[in-house]
């Protein structure tokens, strides 16, 4: 493998944050400097954590996942007051979801190791599975290349319900059939059978979406020391109840903190992305087997548009009696992570970084500092055949990342022709239109009854011109079919659906192409945290 870095333009909060703009950096409590990380360590040492309870739960959970010894040792290390975590999280996507989930894990593993060495303290990597999430449309699919098109393939649950990913049962046989259909679109390689068995072993041990995700991530990162936590696990939820009570008691201050911080963001010229109702409590409650966001109305906590109502005392009692009924939303999830773990750094994608900029005053409301927020590593893989296509088309490696591939294709095609087809036909259409306008005026003057026919005559002439243009383009494209297919392959591989590769492609494609140790070999590469995009030639 060969790794290169390129600067890819970013926008909004992310761009200004990475460029060191003081105004947006003031929305975060720590800058990304070594001194700031030392200050973070000092601040964490001033706080108390219920480490032993968390360790007991994580040992049981990761042992059930058959995690490696390095993971279990890292869990035990969390019991020591001088151990800290680098954390990231994601929904439990089928087959681990898009590549950026894998890249988040790589990011926390890399940063944890680097900070352990530079700060001289134990730092362990933790991945927070958003098991409470109930939006199945976010996790029930993957993308694949089929019939020269990128297509979304959805796993249709035969018994869908508005439950969390931790509680949504997965039909193993149906999912196995779905996975086999996906692998049929991959090239048959020496690794295919092993990868299918690898995935099936994880599936066989799973009852829910989170189970499948957790088993697969554990197997992919078997010897890395990665710790997994299911945010909706009932045993974890018991440990979180004191903080849920704090959120309920401070829900007005939490909402006010969010609104005030969003006003700061607006004044800086950014558009807030967290949308909440004015009376939101920022806690979900399971009601009638559905996850319902609570709101406050006239001193009562209500759900389902008032169909269910609770007093403060009733809600607290229910939390103590049935803690698993409660879960966080986008605002309180970061707070809960901060409550549970001694977080040295949080790693997030561009969207997460933007919405975390809206949470500073919310953190302060509950007595926390926002941890250092580190943008995750961004990575694109370039297979040898794609590198060859780029070379054959005389494109630079950075071109597909800095330009629209369709535009590159059009420019290349135009350069193969003496005169651009579009320009020539536009000129012809304009000249014909001018001539026909004069002709129609003449017809109307001589015989007004033929005016409508003259108008139809112009339409037919235009139709014939457009038909000629399409036929000419079709013939030209056929002439350069080999080269244009290279553009198609480049787009599928590097910018599928016009998006970054890591937002569309799934890791299983690369495991199938390069073997089960693919991710391990990726992690051997040196990565930097300067916001540049990493291009890895395979």
Swiss-Prot record:
One of its GO terms (molecular function) is ligase activity. Its EC number is 6.-.-.-. Keywords: Coiled coil, Ligase. It is an enzyme of class 6 (ligase). Residues 248-268 form a coiled coil. It comes from the Bacteria. It holds the Pfam family CC_BshC. Belongs to the BshC family. Involved in bacillithiol (BSH) biosynthesis. May catalyze the last step of the pathway, the addition of cysteine to glucosamine malate (GlcN-Mal) to generate BSH. This is Putative cysteine ligase BshC. It comes from Bacillus cereus (strain G9842).
């Amino acid at each position: 493998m060969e790794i290169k870095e390129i600067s890819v333009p970013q926008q909004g909060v992310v761009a200004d944050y990475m460029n060191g703009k003081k105004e947006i950096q003031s929305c975060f409590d720590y800058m990304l400097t070594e001194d700031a990380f030392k200050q973070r360590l000092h601040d964490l040492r001033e706080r108390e954590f219920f480490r032993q309870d968390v360790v007991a739960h994580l040992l049981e959970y990761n042992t059930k996942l058959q995690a490696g010894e390095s993971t279990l040792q890292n869990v035990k290390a969390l019991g020591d007051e001088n151990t800290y975590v680098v954390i990231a999280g994601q929904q439990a996507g089928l087959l681990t979801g898009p590549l950026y989930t894998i890249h988040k894990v790589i990011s926390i593993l890399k940063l944890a190791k680097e900070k352990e060495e530079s700060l001289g303290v134990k730092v362990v990597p933790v991945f927070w599975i958003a098991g409470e999430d109930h939006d199945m449309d976010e996790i029930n699919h993957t993308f694949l290349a089929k019939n020269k098109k990128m297509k979304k393939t959805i796993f249709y649950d035969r018994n869908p319900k508005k439950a969390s990913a931790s509680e949504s049962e997965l039909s193993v046989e149906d999912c196995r059939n779905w996975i086999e259909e996906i692998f049929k679109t991959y090239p048959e390689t020496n690794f295919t059978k092993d990868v299918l068995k690898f995935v099936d072993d994880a599936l066989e041990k799973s009852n829910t979406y989170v189970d499948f995700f957790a088993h697969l991530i554990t197997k992919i990162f078997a010897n890395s020391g990665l710790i997994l936590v299911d945010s909706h696990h009932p045993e974890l939820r018991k440990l979180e109840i004191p903080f849920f009570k704090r959120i309920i008691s401070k829900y007005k201050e939490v909402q006010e903190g969010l609104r005030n911080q969003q006003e700061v963001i607006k004044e800086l010229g950014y558009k807030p992305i967290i949308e909440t109702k004015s009376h939101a409590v920022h806690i979900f409650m399971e009601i009638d087997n559905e996850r319902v966001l609570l709101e406050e109305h006239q001193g009562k906590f209500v759900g389902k548009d008032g169909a269910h109502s609770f007093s403060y005392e009733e809600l607290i009692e229910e939390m103590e009696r049935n803690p698993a009924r409660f879960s966080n939303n986008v605002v309180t999830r970061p707070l809960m992570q901060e409550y549970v773990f001694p977080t040295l750094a949080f790693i997030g994608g561009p969207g997460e970084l933007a919405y975390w900029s809206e949470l500073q005053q919310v953190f302060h409301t509950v007595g926390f500092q926002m941890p250092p927020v580190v943008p995750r590593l961004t990575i694109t893989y370039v297979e040898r055949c794609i590198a060859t296509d780029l070379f054959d088309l005389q494109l630079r490696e950075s071109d597909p990342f800095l330009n629209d591939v369709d535009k590159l294709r059009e420019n290349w095609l135009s350069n193969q022709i003496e005169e651009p087809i579009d320009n020539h036909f536009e000129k012809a259409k304009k000249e014909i239109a001018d001539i026909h306008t004069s002709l129609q005026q003449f017809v109307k003057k001589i015989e007004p009854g033929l005016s409508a026919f003259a108008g139809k005559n112009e339409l037919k002439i235009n139709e014939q011109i457009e038909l000629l243009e399409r036929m000419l383009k079709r013939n030209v494209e056929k002439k350069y079919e080999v080269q244009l297919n290279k553009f198609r392959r480049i787009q599928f591989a590097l910018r599928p659906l016009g998006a970054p590769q890591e937002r569309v492609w799934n890791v299983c494609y690369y495991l199938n192409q390069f073997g089960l140790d693919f991710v391990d070999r990726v992690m051997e590469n040196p990565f930097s945290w300067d916001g540049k995009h990493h291009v890895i030639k395979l």
